A protein has these predicted regions:
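Buried hydrophobic packing segments
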Residues: 2-6, 28, 115-122
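Residues that form or flank phosphate/diphosphate-binding pockets in enzymes
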Residues: 1, 110
Length: 144
């Protein structure tokens, strides 16, 4: 939502922002597909055509589960401007990413490591080329 948009607008030219959601709740990716190349100003006027509530959102990464992505318009604008895309990951990818992330010594939650899940081979997004540099934000602390 707003955090992703702020991060994206703060990136230098040449960087792209990809957002990550899970198969159990991906309203942003669905809105992205439905919106296509619709003008940014139109997105707000036609909100209900593109951003519709997700039925029964569920995931181990529960901190990114919303029935709607409320700041989605800004996310779409940043992804379009930067050449990024929404990525949808499986629950297996969320679990594997969390296990990998914990090995860094950072007390990260499944939600906080969802960005790493977007880099795993099962992700729906663009693959990372050899030598390409990426940044991932671990944005949630595990409290369990």
């Amino acid at each position: 939502g707003a955090f992703a948009a702020c991060m994206g607008w703060g990136l230098r030219e040449g960087y792209e922002l990809d957002t990550v959601q899970t198969e159990g709740g991906a309203p942003l990716e669905r809105a992205w597909r439905l919106a296509g190349s619709t003008d940014a100003d139109e997105l707000g006027r036609r909100w209900g055509e593109f951003m519709t509530p997700w039925d029964d959102p569920h995931s181990l990464a529960d901190g990114i589960l919303d029935d709607e992505t409320y700041d989605w318009q800004a996310d779409v604008e940043v992804m379009r401007a930067s050449g990024g895309h929404p990525i949808v990951v499986t629950e297996d990818a969320v679990e594997r990413a969390w296990e990998l992330a914990k090995r860094t010594g950072v007390n990260v939650s499944p939600t906080g490591s969802a960005g790493l899940a977007g880099l795993l081979p099962t992700a729906s997004g663009p693959s990372v080329a050899p030598g390409e540099r990426v940044g991932i934000v671990f944005s949630g602390v595990f409290r369990g």
